[in-house]
Amino acid sequence: GLAAEDALLRAVLRPGDHVLMGNDVYGGTHRLVRRIFGPWQIALTTVELGDLDIAREALERLRPRVLWLETPSNPLMKITDVTALAEIAHAVGALVVVDNTFATPYLQQPLVLGADVVVHSTTKYLGGHSDVLGGAVITNDAELAEQVQFQQFAAGAVSGPM
């Protein structure tokens, strides 16, 4: 899942960009942005996205390139209003990314709710036993999909035999 997230973020972020994410996202995602992208001048701010007033204030003040959310979140299982956040985020020009790993596409379709990109850790819900590694990036934006595919091709972050 993290390789999929990494390919997406490399496709959209540039030095000086800002990522706003929930304060309870998966630790690996937080670590990826803070410790891998941080040295390349990518700023990260975390807030309680379940409180729309706090989220709105942060989005309007920071004007991030990416709003990253999980619903339900991992590990606290907090629920976030994807539609409301997407509306606010799009008003300030942010790309809305939803980690939909816990909900799965069966229970929630974030693209229908207004998200721009959906990511899944297929390690968790397809493998389930950490014996298969994988991730998915889904978007309706053909240009963005092409940029992510290039990152995956160029960096080799795709599933394949060893």
Locate each region found by the language model.
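Conserved PLP-enzyme active-site core in the AAT-like
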Residues: G1-M162
